[in-house]
Structures are given as C-alpha cells and as structure tokens.
Amino acid sequence: MDCEDRFVLTDLPSEKADGIVTNHTHRCRGCAGCISSNKGTCAIDDDFTNIIPEILSHRVLEIRTGIRDSQFRMPMRKAVERLSNVLQAFTDAGGNIPLDKDSVALREIDIIVDGVRTDGFETYARELLDMGPVEEVTFRYE
C-alpha cells in the first residue's frame, strides 16, 4: 500500500506520526453538530479538529496507542470518541441523512497497540470506529 494513503495517529513518542494526540485534545461536548448542523465537522476548536479532515482524506488510519481497562488510554480515547461521532455523519444515526461515503477516502483503521490483548478492547474499538465509510478495523499487539 502506498505510504501516502496512510495517516498515522499516535499518543506515543514518535517522529513517524502524521498526527499526535496530546493532553490538549478536548472531550466531545455532545453538541451533535458533527451529525446535524456541521455534518462531518467537529465544532471543538483544538489541534485534533484540524487533524480530522486529514484522517478522512487517507484510505487507512493507523492508530498507535496503549490500552487501559480495555479502552483506549487517554488522550487517545478522547480523540477516538470524537472521530467516532464524525463517522456517524455517514450513517443514519438519529434519523440523520447520511453524508456520501464516497466523499472521503477513509476505509480502513489499523489499531496497533503497545501492550497485550485484553478482553473486550476489540469489541469496544469496533463499536466506536466500524461505521460510516470504514469497512475494516484490524488489530495488532506489540
């Protein structure tokens, strides 16, 4: 696969990442603008908001992070929850008229976990990310 078609998002120290999630990433406020008034766009003003369009413009999102209590650890959890809400704009969630999946490139999410597999994590991650334009979510543990 062409490297240009992959966006690497991490909360781990890395020089190879395209986007780094920091403690300055805010939690979703629940305004639902991403599925109603500003479909596919997050209303929060922080660095992660600027990364979302980049993620959607690549065929593959590679998430590199650790897990805690069978969930993404902070701050990645905040970022993934917000991305999940944006992905809902491409579904009929809440009676929404979905955005066209072909308007974005994203189709696959590869989650590379720094640690060992824990019960429930993959189900949790798929519930958040396997929707809208995403056709496949895969996992690897290092």
What is each stretch, according to the model?
Residues M1-V86, L129-E142:
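N-terminal beta1-alpha1-beta2 submodule of the flavodoxin-like/Rossmannoid cofactor-binding fold
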Residues Q88-E135:
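Short, glycine-/small-residue-rich phosphate/pyrophosphate-handling segment
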